[in-house]
Amino acid sequence: MLSPKRTRFRKQHRGRMKGTSYRGNHISFGRYALQALEPSWITARQIEAGRRAISRYARRGGKIWVRLFPDKPVTLRPAETRMGSGKGSPEYWVSVVKPGRILYEIGGVSENVARTAMLLAASKMPIRTQFIIEG
């Protein structure tokens, strides 16, 4: 699963997801892509599940690019712990996704293979997505 090798700070604020994505919203590498339509946090596990779904369907044909990286730590407190005594420890990593962000790209396969592969990956995502074609 994806996670940063090292970060300057162990814990982060949750932040807000407002507006649309103005970076990472164009196809850069492949010919077909999966684009987010809603704002959400996407966990490293979900990113990996989507990547596996695409690569299993596409087999050896084509190349896959994962266009998002989980760089935000999410902290959780242990179960049945009283309030206070500081912030919980980092449990997993998420990527902050805004509408318009490209999640995955694929190239070197036919359109119907790419469309089906992206549909499988989209079912692993917690948000609505759309399939887009370069050009």
Curated annotation (Swiss-Prot):
Alphabetized CDD domains for the sequence: Ribosomal_L16_L10e (cd01433)
Main location: plastid
GO BP terms: mitochondrial translation
Keyword Zinc: no
Record key words, sorted: Chloroplast, Plastid, Ribonucleoprotein, Ribosomal protein
Name of a matching Pfam family: Ribosomal_L16
Keyword Chloroplast appears in the UniProt entry: yes
Location of the region described as Disordered in the Swiss-Prot/TrEMBL record: 1-20
Regions of compositional bias (Basic residues) in chain numbering: 1-17
GO molecular function: rRNA binding; structural constituent of ribosome
GO cellular component, one term: mitochondrial large ribosomal subunit
Localization (cell): Plastid, Chloroplast
Complexes and interactors: Part of the 50S ribosomal subunit.
Similarity comment text for this entry: Belongs to the universal ribosomal protein uL16 family.
PANTHER family membership: 50S/60S RIBOSOMAL PROTEIN L16, LARGE RIBOSOMAL SUBUNIT PROTEIN UL16M
UniProt xrefs under NCBIfam families: rplP_bact
Protein name: Large ribosomal subunit protein uL16c
Species this chain originates from: Lemna minor (Common duckweed)
